[in-house]
Every structure is written in C-alpha cells, then in structure tokens.
C-alpha cells in the first residue's frame, strides 16, 4: 500500500487523503487515468503513456496545465518518498469539483491531479495481458 500520494497540488499521507464529494470524476467518471510500470526506477514506455494521457485530456476538453517535466518530477519525488524500486504509477486527472450537473460547458473548473505509487516486490513483464482500445 502506498504511504505518500500527490493529490490536488499537495503530497499527503495515503490514509489522510480525501476526494471532494462533488469531484466530477467521482460522480460521472469524468476523468482520465494512466498506469505506468517502473522497475529499478526505469519507466516502461513513459512517453507513450504520457502522450496518451494528454491526448485523452484534450479529447475530453479537460484543461490540464501541468507540463510533462513537472509531472515527471512529481512522480520521481513520490517514488523516492515511498522508497519504491519496482511498482506502478497511477495518474488520474479528473475534470474537477463542481455542483452536480451533467453539463460542464461554460464552467470554470480546475482539474484535480492525483498520483499514487504502488510498490511491487516483482513484476513479470511476460504475463499475458488483455487487449484494450485506446484513444
């Protein structure tokens, strides 16, 4: 289980972190996520995952202002804080917090970035996965 996560601009203890009840990701699944595996602090296909994250955010018209370099810095800090050598990085960007309403057009909503590091004892890259369709 992760110890330190990054949520809405702050590093926080996993047990103390909270998601606002009016987060659109909570109500409507109005969010994008990516999972990146790392082994000995080397990321598996980092650029492709980040490119897909940004493409998905753009497709959903989520106005995300973080740069790739700032995301990578946060991720590296979390890996160090959690003393993880092998594991996965879960990145989620929700549209943000607003009153419960199906429409988000015309609202000034700040996206919420959450990053969680999950430590693993071993990752077998030869395990057969499943097919998925991505944007």
Regions found by a protein language model. Name each.
Residues 1-135:
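Conserved alpha/beta cores of soluble small-molecule-handling proteins
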């Amino acid at each position: 289980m992760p110890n330190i996560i990054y949520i809405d601009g702050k590093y926080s203890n996993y047990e103390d972190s909270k998601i606002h009840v009016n987060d659109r990701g909570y109500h409507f699944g109005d969010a994008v996520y990516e999972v990146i595996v790392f082994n000995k602090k080397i990321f598996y296909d980092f650029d492709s995952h980040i490119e897909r994250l940004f493409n998905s955010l753009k497709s959903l018209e989520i106005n995300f202002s973080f740069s790739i370099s700032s995301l990578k810095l946060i991720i590296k800090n979390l890996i160090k804080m959690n003393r993880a050598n092998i594991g996965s990085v879960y990145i989620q960007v929700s549209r943000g917090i607003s009153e419960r309403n199906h429409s988000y057009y015309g609202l000034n909503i700040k996206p919420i970035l959450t990053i969680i590091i999950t430590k693993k004892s071993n990752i077998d890259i030869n395990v057969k996965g499943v097919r998925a369709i991505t944007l």
